[in-house]
Curated annotation (Swiss-Prot):
Coiled coil: none
Protein origin, superkingdom: Bacteria
Any GO MF annotation of the entry: sodium:proton antiporter activity
Protein name: Na(+)/H(+) antiporter NhaA
Species of the source: Brucella melitensis biotype 1 (strain ATCC 23456 / CCUG 17765 / NCTC 10094 / 16M)
CDD domains (UniProt xref): S49_Sppa_N_C (cd07023)
Length: 736
């Protein structure tokens, strides 16, 4: 049969595409783009329903992520073994530069993510998500540059990505393992041992290895270890002959299998994974998702953490003589490849699915991965396209080069980082309105620290961070996690932590207390004033519902007191309350025997009739305490108090009246007042009691919930009933 040139041409084009280095990356990009389109089209429900369709014991999504991806990891394992024994990683000099760079590219993104999510254990599980590099995507982008990228850079990127994949496999095996089933795990070890014995006995036929690999996958899947690990273990057991072999050598079992899997994995397995997991529906998705620390942690980890980690580690290794720069590659090109390492699509999404069970967190993960990968791909490609080969002009940061090219590159680097900083800060400010009052925007606190050596000081955003301490509750000793109260013991720690902030010009204290023990009130007041003098900081007090009696005594520690117009303020007096049961014991047939050495030892005994002299003695004590309280008010509010005769009578007023009486300095709320004082860039940092890794603080200030035992709970319940009643009575005096 004769074939016309027209009929032969399409086949030739297809073959050239499949054989090209960029084909795998382009196919994966197309699959991801198609998934996004379908997920936001009229076919979205069909798409998501299909992924949750059960085929046997697993849904389609689980078959893809647990079974199909095991084939991907099998190929990864084969590549790792071949490179370690017969490739670029066969010698230590060749391993040093990509190995050190890969370590930096794993560690720094994880640190950035952990810094942004350290206060949320659920989100912190995803620390490894931004640590991976997608070899297909990255090499695909690099291949689009053609001859502009020297072959040494391609080898460096491929080797680094393989080591990155090895690190990801180890991370998955160690940190993302569910409950272990020892019988299945034991069976998996036995199967792996069989594979090892076959390798040592020089079994070269692939069929026994493949059958054993399927059995190994079954046991690993049921053991609790993620099933994809089975693919890597099986790959490491498939023999590679000691003699060096070419990539297309069909004599070695490893080369045979790698050659057979390369195209199916690149054009079937990975695109299916991308299509199944990149579909994000933007319907009903709030803008706040973009500003969530989970999304930002992944985005910044991939885009900034990868480039700084890889390039910084590589630069350090080269400058210290541990490794050599890739032949023919300039520093600019090496930096461009470091940016490309932030493309973490396949492995990053895969680790994200293992980290987070909830749909919302998985969506935030995918948004972070897609955004970070896209930024890395675009910026890396543009920089590499504009870069020149190894010349002194491309090395302005490390050589005294005054050429115009060197200066232009230096300007580009500064403008690039400055633009990244401004854009990130702007986006965060836009999203701040959607955040709660005291929620910190982690991006705005973390990013200046990362870039402060690159951005001139005069260009940095000026922000003021104010520590906030919440003092809420009745004032008395003996508080527990079940009945939190205010005392010097329970507040000293957070007060010291707040005042220890060297960069804060002031400390804000939020008070909501009806009062209580006068001694504890004065001790807390005194501690605040001592810390303010020691650290030379202003103290601003903000009254919420009530600052009465002892609560107002603590409020006097503020240089300025601000309240809401409806807040309750005042009650400058002293009250004592107790219960009397003089006839109770007789009625229930109980005789109480009391023996004293001192005539006044039974003063105000609740089981004896009240005596007039005892009442007079108590009132004398109250007058002394009241006088001390009045002196404190006059000292702290000197020149501000009005002439109202009821000022020290124990009456209390609304915030509006209290302002006219001089008991407070003004009306308003915390954020508005601090913005007016320190500018719109002010940030509030809530100071909380320290939390353990396993214990969680119950509301208020008290013991860790992890340390509360049933016996303690029972004791606290019995001991606290009357105290709770008394505390409720204190709040009730102010209608609360």
């Amino acid at each position: 049969m004769n074939h016309s040139p027209q009929s032969a041409r399409p086949v030739s084009i297809m073959r050239r595409f499949l054989d090209s280095e960029a084909a795998g990356g382009i196919t994966l990009m197309a699959a991801a783009a198609l998934a996004l389109i379908v997920a936001n089209s009229p076919f979205a429900q069909t798409y998501f329903d299909a992924l949750h369709l059960y085929i046997g014991p697993l849904s389609l999504a689980h078959w893809i992520n647990d079974a199909l991806m095991a084939i991907f990891f099998l190929l990864v394992g084969l590549e790792i073994k071949r490179e370690m024994l017969d490739g670029q990683l066969a010698s230590w000099p060749n391993r040093m530069l990509p190995g050190i760079a890969a370590a930096g590219g794993v560690i720094l993104p994880a640190i950035i993510f952990a810094v942004l999510n350290h206060d949320n254990p659920a989100k912190l599980r995803g620390w490894a998500v931004p640590s991976a590099t997608d070899i297909a995507f990255a090499l695909g982008v690099l291949s689009l540059l053609g001859s502009r990228a020297p072959s040494s850079l391609k080898v460096f990127l491929a080797t680094l990505a393989i080591l990155d994949d090895l690190a990801a496999v180890v991370i998955i095996a160690i940190f993302y393992t569910a409950e272990i089933s020892m019988p299945y795990l034991g069976a998996a070890f036995i199967t792996a041992a069989v594979l090892f014995v076959m390798n040592r006995m020089d079994v070269v036929k692939l069929l026994p290895y493949l059958i054993s690999a399927v059995i190994l996958w079954f046991f690993v899947f049921n053991s609790g270890v993620h099933a994809t690990v089975a693919g890597v273990v099986a790959a490491l057991m498939i023999p590679l002959k000691p003699a060096p072999g070419r990539p297309d050598d069909m004599t070695s079992p490893l080369h045979k299998l790698e050659h057979a899997l390369a195209k199916p994995v690149a054009f079937i397995v990975v695109p299916i994974f991308g299509f199944a997991n990149a579909g994000i529906s933007f319907k009903g998705l709030e803008a706040s998702v973009l500003g969530d620390t989970l999304t930002l942690g992944i985005l910044l980890g991939l885009f900034l953490g990868k480039q700084f980690g890889v390039f910084g580690a590589a630069w350090l290794a080269i400058k210290t003589g541990l490794a050599e720069k890739p032949m023919g590659a300039s520093w600019v090109q090496l930096y461009g490849v470091a940016i490309l390492c932030g493309i973490g699509f396949t492995m990053s999404i895969f680790i994200g699915l293992l980290s987070f069970p909830s749909d919302l967190m998985q969506t935030e993960t995918k948004i972070g991965v897609l955004s970070g990968s896209a930024l890395s791909a675009i910026c890396g490609y543009l920089l590499l396209r504009a870069a020149r080969p190894d010349q002194s002009a491309a090395n302005p940061l490390w050589k005294a080069d005054e050429s115009p090219e060197a200066k232009n590159f230096g300007r580009f680097l500064c403008v690039f980082h400055f633009a990244s900083y401004i854009a990130s800060t702007y986006c965060t400010e836009r999203l701040q309105a959607a955040s709660s009052l005291l929620r910190r925007s982690s991006l705005e606190f973390a990013l200046p620290g990362l870039l402060k050596r690159l951005i001139p000081r005069r260009f940095r955003a000026v922000e003021t961070e104010i520590p906030v301490v919440r003092l809420h509750g009745a004032i008395m000793t003996g508080g527990t996690s079940l009945r939190p109260t205010l005392s010097l013991a329970s507040t000293a720690g957070i007060l010291e932590k707040a005042f220890a902030d060297k960069h804060a010009p002031a400390v804000a204290i939020s008070i909501n207390s009806p009062g209580g023990a006068p001694v504890q009130s004065r001790l807390i007041y005194r501690r605040i004033r001592d810390l303010a003098a020691e650290h030379q900081k202003k103290v601003f007090v903000f009254v919420e519902d009530v600052a009465a009696s002892g609560g107002y005594m603590i409020a006097l520690a503020g240089d300025e007191i601000i309240a809401d117009p409806s807040s309750i303020v005042g009650s400058i007096g002293v009250v004592s309350a107790s219960f009397g049961f003089p006839e109770l014991l007789k009625k229930i047939g109980v005789e109480r025997r009391v023996y004293t050495a001192g005539s006044n030892k039974v003063t105000l005994d609740p089981f004896q009739p009240e005596k007039a002299e005892d009442i007079e003695r108590l009132k004398a004590l109250q007058l002394e305490i009241h006088a001390t309280f009045i002196d404190m008010v006059k000292e702290r509010r000197a020149g501000k108090l009005g002439d109202n005769p009821d000022l020290f009578s124990g009456l209390f007023w609304t915030g509006t009246t209290a302002a006219s009486l001089g008991l407070i300095d003004g009306l308003g709320d915390m954020l508005s007042f601090l913005r007016k004082t320190y500018g719109d860039k002010v940030k509030l940092k809530l100071i909380q009691p320290q939390r353990g890794l396993l214990g969680r603080k119950l509301p208020g200030i008290g013991m860790d919930s992890g340390s509360v035992e049933p016996a303690q709970i029972a004791a606290h319940l019995g001991d606290g009933l009357l105290c709770v009643a008394e505390e409720k009575a204190i709040w009730a005096r102010y209608g609360l």
